[in-house]
Amino acid sequence: MIVGLGTDIAEIERVEKALARSGENFARRILTDSELEQFHASKQQGRFLAKRFAAKEAASKALGTGIAQGVTFHDFTISHDKLGKPLLILSGQAAELASQLQVENIHLSISDERHYAMATVILERR
C-alpha cells in the first residue's frame, strides 16, 4: 500500500548560480558528508547537486512535511546499489516519521535532462 508520494523538479542553472554565489556552503546545506565526497569528485557539480536537491525535496513531500517540522536535507542520504539504482536512506526526524507511517519500502527515481533534474519518491507499507 502506498503511504506517500512526492515529486520535485529543480532547474539546474538555478542551482549552479546558487553554487557560484554561495560556494560550498550551499552544497553543505543540502548534502550529507558522504554525498559531499561524491560532489567533490563530480565533474558536473551543479547537476549533481540539483539531482540530490530534487530527490530530497521529493522525499520530504512523500513524508507529508516538506523540508519543515524538524525534517532537514541532512535527514536524507542518496546512494546507489551496485547496479547504479538510487537508494534513499532516512535518518533523524525523517526516519521517525517513516516509522510512524510503517514504511517498509522506499522507491526513488532520479532523472535529468539538459535544464532540469527531477525525482519521484514512493513510500510503501505492506
Curated annotation (Swiss-Prot):
It comes from Vibrio cholerae serotype O1 (strain ATCC 39315 / El Tor Inaba N16961). Mg(2+) binds at D8, E57. It is found in: Cytoplasm. GO terms for molecular function: holo-[acyl-carrier-protein] synthase activity; magnesium ion binding. Its cofactor is Mg(2+). It holds the Pfam family ACPS. InterPro entries: 4-PPantetheinyl_Trfase_dom, 4-PPantetheinyl_Trfase_dom_sf, ACPS, P-Pant_transferase_sf, Ppantetheine-prot_Trfase_dom. This is Holo-[acyl-carrier-protein] synthase. Keywords: Cytoplasm, Fatty acid biosynthesis, Fatty acid metabolism, Lipid biosynthesis, Lipid metabolism, Magnesium, Metal-binding, Transferase. Belongs to the P-Pant transferase superfamily. AcpS family. It catalyses: apo-[ACP] + CoA = holo-[ACP] + adenosine 3',5'-bisphosphate + H(+). GO terms for biological process: fatty acid biosynthetic process. Its main location: cytoplasm. Its EC number is 2.7.8.7. GO terms for cellular component: cytoplasm. Transfers the 4'-phosphopantetheine moiety from coenzyme A to a Ser of acyl-carrier-protein. NCBIfam families: acpS, pantethn_trn.
